[in-house]
Amino acid sequence: MTTVNTDLIIYDDLAQTAFLERRQDNLAIFNASSNGAILLDNELIEGDFRKRAFYKVGGSIESRDVNSTEKVTGKKIGAGEAVSVKAPWKYGPYETTEEAFKRRGRSVDEFSEVIGTDVADATLEGYVKYGLKALAAAIGANADMVVTADIETDGKKTLTRGLRKYGDKFNRVVLFVMHSATYFDIVDEAIANKIYEEAGVVVYGGQPGTLGKPVLVTDTMDADAILGLVAGAVTVTESQAPGFRSYDINDQENLAIGYRAEGVVNVDLLGYSWDTSKGDNPDLTKIGTAGNWKKHFTSNKSTAGVLIKLGSAAGE
C-alpha cells in the first residue's frame, strides 16, 4: 500500500498555522499599544522600493489691498517623492533529531509548533527594531529635530525639550520610545521630586515623568536616546508573503527535521525617504545609517518625530 499525505505529519502547515495565530494576536496588540505611532501592516509591494509622488504647496493667506489695481504674480506648486525601501530577513534554520522529542515522550510535530510561535515573536521584535533604527537615523540626521538633555539635571524637562520642537503642534507627539534603563531613570527622578508628602502619602503630578503620554519601553532602543513620535511615524509593511520551509534531514546518523523562514518588509517613515543612491536590500546597519535617509517634507512639524539625545547613559 502506498503512503499518501494523510498518513504523514506535514510540518509546513502546522508551523505556519502557529505563526499566523501568534502574529494575529501580536499585530492587534502592538498597533493599539503604540498609540498609532508605529504601525505594522502587510501588503503586497512590487520592486525594491515603493515610490509615491505628492504635491508640495505650503501656502498661506496674505493681506489684500481692496483699493489696489496692481497685477499679482502666480505662484508655483511643487512636487516631492516619498520612498520606502525593502529589507529582506531570514530566520533559522533550526534543526532537531526526532529522537530528541521521542525520548521526552513528545510528538515530533511539537517542534513545528514551537518554532512557528517563536518566528512570529522574532519577526515582531525584528520589525520594531527596523522601524526604530530607521527613525533614529533619519530624525538624527535632521538637526532641527534633535535636542540634548540630561535626566538627572533636567528631570521632566527632558521630554518637554523634545516637545518644544513641535511648538503649538506639541500634541501631535503621541508616544515616547525609550530603553528600559532610561524609563526607570525618568520614573526614579519623578519619585525623588514628589510634589507633596504627608504621613507617608505621596501625591505625584500626572503619570510619573512621562507627561501623561504613553511610553513604549524596549531594549532594542539605544539607552542614550529617546524618540518622541507622532501618529504614523513609521509603517513597517510585510511586503511579500513570508516563506516557511520544514524539511527532512536524512543524511545524518539520526533522522532529523529542520525549519527555516524568510521574508521582506518595507520601512516607510513619515516625512523621510530612503536615498535610492545608497542601494537596495539594506541590512539593519544600513537601515540605521543617518546618511541613507533624507527629509522630503518641508515642515519639520509634519515629520515623524523628535530625537532626544541624553547627556549621560541611562542607569548611570
PLM region spans:
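Hydrophobic face of amphipathic alpha-helices
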Residues: 14-19, 48-49, 53, 107-127, ...
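Extended, solvent-exposed, turn-rich assembly/linker loops in the middle of proteins
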Residues: 137-214
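N-terminal "assembly arms/tails" that initiate or stabilize quaternary assembly
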Residues: 1-85, 237, 242, 297-316
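Short conserved micro-motifs at the rims of enzyme active sites and ligand-binding pockets
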Residues: 65, 187-189, 226-229, 268-279
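Extended, compositionally biased alpha-helical segments that mediate assembly or anchoring
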Residues: 2-3, 7, 238-316
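Short acidic, glycine/tyrosine-flanked loop/strand segments centered on an H-E-D-like triad
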Residues: 77-106
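Extended serine/threonine-enriched, polar tracts that run as long, contiguous segments within proteins
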Residues: 200-256
